[in-house]
């Protein structure tokens, strides 16, 4: 998935199961700090990331688990810098 720097995006995580699975979001295999206001897990389980920068690029994974097991789905996020008029002038 490719997005522009400065934007926000939702990484989808559609899960179902019984008992209801718990969702954990990871980046590069490490749980994301949900105390950081940059990240919000929506009621659907999707991860919303605000204020994207190229440093946010990487592999994110949605992990769903319950007492019967767990499953993980990775998604690659690529954040591209925005071209500005100043950038274009500098390239001449």
Sequence positions of predicted segments:
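Short strand-edge motifs at loop-to-beta-strand transitions and within beta-strands
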Residues: 9, 45-48
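Flexible inter-domain hinge/linker segments at boundaries of tandem extracellular adhesion modules
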Residues: 1-5, 20, 26-36, 40-45, ...
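Extracellular/luminal low-complexity segments enriched in Ser/Thr/Pro
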Residues: 47-56
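Conserved Ig-like domain signature around the intradomain disulfide
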Residues: 9-11, 21, 56-64, 73
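Surface-exposed loop and edge beta-strand positions of immunoglobulin-like domains
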Residues: 14-16, 50, 65
């Amino acid at each position: 998935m490719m997005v522009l720097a400065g934007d926000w995006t939702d990484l989808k995580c559609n899960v179902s199961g019984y008992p209801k699975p718990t969702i954990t979001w990871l980046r590069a295999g490490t749980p994301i700090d949900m105390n950081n206001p940059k990240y919000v897990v929506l009621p659907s389980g999707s991860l919303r990331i605000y204020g994207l920068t190229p440093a946010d690029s990487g592999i994110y994974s949605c992990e769903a688990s319950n007492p019967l097991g767990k499953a993980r789905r990775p998604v690659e996020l690529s954040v591209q810098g925005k071209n500005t008029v100043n950038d274009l002038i500098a390239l001449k």
